[in-house]
A protein has these predicted regions:
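C-terminal beta-strand-rich structural cap/linker in extracellular carbohydrate-active enzymes
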Residues: 3, 197-212
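Residues immediately flanking
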Residues: 169-170, 212
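Loop/helix patches that line or flank the sugar-binding groove of alpha-linked glycan CAZymes
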Residues: 1-164, 170-175
Length: 212
């Protein structure tokens, strides 16, 4: 996936009301694994689904492809720390195979890249925990807006006299929006924009956090 997609998904979830939860690897954009055999799975439900697919007439390859996309084990593979053996996770034998992309997708590489998914997550967390905005993100109301926009997820976080608009364009086309008043400040953009106005055009997979 593109890094803009991953940053947008993080924006839309971490700024909702409730306790933010980051599952291992989410913050660097770890992906599903390219499974080679049903024997590589640890999840019993996945193995059961594989055998049911064979009984239904699927070939071994098709059955493996289908269960591989949906298996819970995709979210359980070892954390990809660096490019060393076993992605720096262990000197032993990991319980699940490593994702083949760990030489490219790992913490060490993203720490050095200012525009990485990992460093964007750090900005998100810093914004949510900042002295200026932590109360609104922790205790503020969450009000859905722009409901007529099918491919747009948008909500306002509101508390006392503060309002923050969170926008995410899930579509493959630009989304044009008009605000009722000039916004005060663009707090965060997954595409590194620094300014925003009353008329907003969001690119595909663009997110924006706007102080109203």
């Amino acid at each position: 996936r593109r890094s803009s997609d991953l940053k947008m998904l993080g924006t839309m979830s971490l700024l909702l009301r409730g306790l933010p939860f980051i599952f291992q690897g989410q913050e660097i954009g770890m992906t599903n694994t390219n499974w080679q055999s049903v024997d590589e799975f640890d999840d019993l439900n996945t193995v059961d689904q594989y055998h049911l697919a064979l009984k239904a007439g699927l070939s071994e390859k098709d059955a493996l492809d289908k269960i591989g996309r949906l298996s819970r084990d995709n979210a359980r593979t070892p954390m990809q720390w660096n490019t060393s053996s076993n992605a720096g996770f262990t000197t032993g034998i990991p319980w699940l195979r490593l994702n083949d992309n760990y030489p490219d997708v790992n913490v060490a590489a993203q720490e050095k890249d200012a525009d990485s998914v990992l460093n964007y997550y750090k900005k998100l967390i810093a914004l949510r925990k900042s002295d200026t905005y932590k109360d609104i993100f922790t205790y503020g109301k969450t009000i859905p807006v722009f409901l007529e926009k099918e491919m747009l997820m948008a909500y306002c976080r509101e508390k006392d006299d503060k309002r923050i608009l969170v926008l995410g364009n899930f579509g493959e086309k630009k989304e044009a929006l008009h605000l009722s008043a000039e916004p005060k400040k663009l707090l965060l953009s997954n595409m590194n924009h620094t300014e925003i106005g009353q008329d907003i055009i969001l690119a595909p997979q663009e997110s924006a956090v706007v102080l109203l």
